[in-house]
């Protein structure tokens, strides 16, 4: 649609002013995220920036701030008030040939943003290994889990990244491409990281209508569930540990991970037969560990239907 000279001057001047404020602009993938409060108070931008980064404050501090805002309470932020009913705007810009395109433009109260982002962090919360020092998984880190670490350009898919940001900020369903690209990297690398586990957990909790899947999506290992996919995943992990402890050679994960995911009824009987030969070695060299593994395998098999 035609735009008057005055309108063009007004919106370009305003946009340039916002983009010059580097402290309140985030580049995520190819998307530049600009955000501001209707009241023009900078503490809202400061807080929102921390919400996006995630790992700059502890989970509990972040959860306390966003939880209070989502319940309609005013929060103190470095001596300045954050009011939940203050209008807040988030603009996602992406390059498009010689122009700039709008990937998303969101308008909501600051309390609603806090609620949406806080629930996202709760969904991706998962037990982390000791070497991982990040309390939370930032948005940038989450998107990087969908990329190939061996290529020079490690940027996430632009459309997927934009759709994921929009879903998190607005509290809507995650894009299917986030789940699909995560699973593709897992199958290609045969490696499940904390971030990838968190993506799968969050996607199933938010998008799935399967009650069993929602119940299995816990922060730590759910030892009480009888969900067949969950139990098989635990069983596969133990079978891998058995082979690694017995021989130290390439594990079942290297050879059977993809087929175990696609045809478990065919692969698991074979893996259990292989387990028996490895257990003989362990009973000779590491009898205590062998007994422990055997009890775990027996307990998990007992959870599977006949």
Predicted regions and their residues:
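Extended alpha-helical scaffolding segments
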Residues: 1-306
């Amino acid at each position: 649609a035609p735009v008057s000279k005055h309108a063009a001057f007004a919106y370009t001047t305003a946009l340039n002013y916002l983009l010059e404020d580097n402290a309140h602009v985030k580049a995520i993938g190819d998307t530049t995220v600009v955000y501001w409060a209707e009241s023009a108070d900078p503490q809202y931008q400061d807080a929102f920036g921390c919400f996006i980064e995630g790992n700059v404050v502890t989970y509990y501090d972040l959860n306390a701030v966003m939880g209070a805002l989502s319940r309609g309470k005013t929060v103190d932020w470095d001596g300045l008030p954050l009011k939940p009913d203050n209008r807040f705007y988030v603009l996602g810009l992406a390059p498009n040939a010689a122009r700039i395109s709008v990937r998303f433009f969101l308008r909501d109260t600051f309390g609603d943003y806090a609620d949406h982002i806080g629930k996202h962090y709760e969904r991706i919360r998962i037990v982390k290994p000791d070497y991982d020092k990040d309390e939370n998984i930032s948005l940038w880190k989450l998107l990087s889990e969908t990329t190939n670490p061996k290529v020079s350009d490690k940027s996430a898919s632009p459309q997927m990244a934009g759709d994921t940001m929009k879903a998190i900020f607005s509290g809507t369903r995650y894009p299917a491409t986030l789940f699909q690209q995560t699973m593709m990297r897992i199958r290609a690398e045969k490696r499940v990281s904390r971030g990838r586990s968190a993506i799968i957990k969050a996607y199933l909790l938010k998008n799935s209508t399967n009650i069993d899947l929602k119940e299995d999506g816990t922060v730590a290992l759910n030892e009480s569930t009888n969900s067949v996919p969950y139990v098989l995943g635990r069983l596969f992990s133990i079978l891998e540990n058995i082979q690694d402890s017995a021989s130290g050679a390439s594990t079942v994960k290297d050879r059977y991970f993809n087929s175990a995911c696609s045809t478990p009824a065919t692969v698991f009987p074979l893996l259990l037969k292989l387990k028996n030969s490895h257990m003989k070695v362990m009973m000779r060299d590491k009898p205590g560990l062998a007994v422990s593994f055997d009890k775990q395998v027996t307990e998990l098999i007992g959870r599977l239907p006949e």
